[in-house]
């Protein structure tokens, strides 16, 4: 699973996910992409589950790029622990997703196969997505 190797700070504040994606909003590596329409957070497990679903569907053909990385630590307190006593331990990592962000890209497969693969991947993700094709001149 994806997670940062080193962090400057082990724990992070929650923050707010606002605005739209100004970076990473175009298909730049492959021919087809899966773009987020809504906002939310993807855990490392969800990113990996969607990748596996796509990889299994396209079999040996094509190439897949993951355009998001879970770099934000999420902490949780153990069960039946009273309030206070400091911030909990880091349990998993998430990637904050803004509308317009390209999550995955694919190349080397027919459009119909790419659509089907992205549909399977989208079913594993908690945010609404859409299929996009690379524009000429990008």
Curated annotation (Swiss-Prot):
<dbReference type="InterPro" id="IPR016180">
    <property type="entry name" value="Ribosomal_uL16_dom"/>
</dbReference>
<dbReference type="GO" id="GO:0022625">
    <property type="term" value="C:cytosolic large ribosomal subunit"/>
</dbReference>
<keyword id="KW-0689">Ribosomal protein</keyword>
<dbReference type="GO" id="GO:0000049">
    <property type="term" value="F:tRNA binding"/>
</dbReference>
<dbReference type="GO" id="GO:0003735">
    <property type="term" value="F:structural constituent of ribosome"/>
</dbReference>
<dbReference type="InterPro" id="IPR036920">
    <property type="entry name" value="Ribosomal_uL16_sf"/>
</dbReference>
<dbReference type="GO" id="GO:0019843">
    <property type="term" value="F:rRNA binding"/>
</dbReference>
<protein>
    <recommendedName>
        <fullName>Large ribosomal subunit protein uL16</fullName>
    </recommendedName>
</protein>
<keyword id="KW-0699">rRNA-binding</keyword>
<dbReference type="GO" id="GO:0006412">
    <property type="term" value="P:translation"/>
</dbReference>
<dbReference type="Pfam" id="PF00252">
    <property type="entry name" value="Ribosomal_L16"/>
</dbReference>
<dbReference type="InterPro" id="IPR020798">
    <property type="entry name" value="Ribosomal_uL16_CS"/>
</dbReference>
<dbReference type="InterPro" id="IPR000114">
    <property type="entry name" value="Ribosomal_uL16_bact-type"/>
</dbReference>
<comment type="subunit">
    <text>Part of the 50S ribosomal subunit.</text>
</comment>
<keyword id="KW-0820">tRNA-binding</keyword>
<comment type="function">
    <text>Binds 23S rRNA and is also seen to make contacts with the A and possibly P site tRNAs.</text>
</comment>
<dbReference type="InterPro" id="IPR047873">
    <property type="entry name" value="Ribosomal_uL16"/>
</dbReference>
<keyword id="KW-0694">RNA-binding</keyword>
<comment type="similarity">
    <text>Belongs to the universal ribosomal protein uL16 family.</text>
</comment>
<keyword id="KW-0687">Ribonucleoprotein</keyword>
